From Swiss-Prot:
Involved in phosphonate degradation. The modification N6-(pyridoxal phosphate)lysine is found at residue 193. Its cofactor is pyridoxal 5'-phosphate. It comes from Vibrio vulnificus (strain YJ016). Keywords: Aminotransferase, Pyridoxal phosphate, Pyruvate, Transferase. The gene is phnW. This is 2-aminoethylphosphonate--pyruvate transaminase. Homodimer. One of its GO terms (biological process) is organic phosphonate catabolic process. GO terms for molecular function: 2-aminoethylphosphonate-pyruvate transaminase activity. Pfam families: Aminotran_5 (PF00266).
């Protein structure tokens, strides 16, 4: 079945027809055919995508990507622990909100939504507060489309002996990284982002020695990261509670298609071409990105809304959807913007068609 329109969003996103077709069969969660041949293969493939070094493992968690973030924050940080988190967008702020809900002390570094974190501020906080045990940062902050400097951030954190948590929700699978070489202890992502699967579960790729320290620390039964991992380890892919079988099988197919494309490097190149084609085309129509080009990620781009008095996002959105494209509203608190994603089953030719559709949808310029 074909899609009526292309989702130009940061996920859920447009998937291939073969990924969707993979969900047309039912699976028994007790069978080796599911647990060993699908779940365990996924777990192994994820680790290999994240690092070429040994010592890492992976665990899948039911729910949204935020559920996996909360599972990590709530399991990795002990009762005497304290978190430092960078908040330069909605998703960094969400990590701080999770810490508040879980009564975890939290130091928030807030450089603003259009700025990268100032590493000297992070350095000062870590040097002056020995109670901080863990640090967290979002790799691609899709509030704006900014790519944060995770290598420098992790280097500062490791120099102070901290456990590093990376929210790579919207970047893993689309931007090459080696989490072992970066010193990342826990990396979190989701099925419905750059791997190009469908929603239903997230996953955590972790240094096994750090994950084992999580035993008995969870603040939630269903979000107990260690217990979920231990169950999968002992029972060869078995989930503690009902797993999203169709989503898991679709993700397996999506991983195969990532390999067929040429791996993360090839996908990153496609996403980059999409993004550069998008920005050039939008500028030709008079739109300007929110961020300077050096801060852009290949994942999603924020554009300033037109200042014309007749412009309304909903009307613009509707005209684009009628032409087969769905874009995203803005999420920046101090600027009127909208966002266009570059990821999913989207190619440069699609972006070129989008630019033509946007030109036709600019109703406020009609004389």
């Amino acid at each position: 079945m074909k899609n009526e329109y292309l989702l130009l969003t940061p996920g859920p996103l447009s998937t291939s027809e073969t990924v969707r077709e993979a969900m047309l069969k039912d699976w028994c969660t007790w069978d080796d055919e599911y647990n060993k041949d699908i779940v365990e293969v996924i777990r192994t493939k994820l680790v290999k995508l994240a690092t070429k070094h040994s010592g890492y493992t992976s665990v899948l968690m039911q729910g949204s990507g935020t559920a996996s973030v909360e599972a990590t924050i709530g399991s990795a940080i002990g009762k005497e622990g304290k978190l430092l988190v960078v908040d330069n967008g909605a998703y960094g702020a969400r990590i701080a909100q999770i810490a508040a809900y879980l009564n975890i002390p939290c130091h928030v570094v807030s450089p603003g939504e259009t700025s990268q974190p100032h590493l000297n501020e992070v350095e000062t906080a870590l040097a002056s507060d020995p109670a901080i045990t863990h640090v967290a940062i979002v790799h691609c902050e899709t509030t704006t489309g900014m790519l944060n400097p995770i290598e420098a951030f992790a280097s500062v954190a490791k120099a102070h002996g901290k456990v590093v948590i990376l929210d790579a929700m919207s970047s893993f699978g689309g931007i090459p990284i080696d989490i072992a070489e970066l010193g990342i202890d826990f990396m979190i992502s989701s099925a419905n982002k750059c791997i190009q699967g469908v929603p239903g579960f997230g996953f955590v790729i972790a240094k096994q020695t750090e994950l084992e320290k999580c035993q008995g620390q969870a603040r939630s039964l269903s979000l107990d990261l260690y217990d979920q991992w231990h169950c999968m380890e002992v029972n060869h892919g078995k989930w503690r509670f009902t797993s999203p079988t169709h989503t898991v099988r679709a993700f397996y197919q999506a991983l195969l298609e990532l390999e067929q494309e040429g791996g993360i490097e090839a996908r990153h190149n496609r996403y980059q071409t999409n993004q550069k084609t998008l920005v050039a085309g939008m500028r030709s129509l008079g739109f300007e990105p929110l961020l300077s080009d050096d801060l852009h990620s290949p994942i999603i781009t924020s554009f300033y809304s037109p200042t014309h008095s007749d412009y309304q996002f909903k009307a613009f959105y509707t005209r684009l959807k009628e032409q087969g494209f769905v874009i995203y509203p803005g999420k920046v608190s101090n600027a009127d913007c909208f966002r266009i994603g570059n990821i999913g089953e989207v190619y440069p030719a699609d972006i070129e068609r989008l630019i033509g559709a946007i030109e036709k949808a600019m109703y406020w310029q009609v004389a």
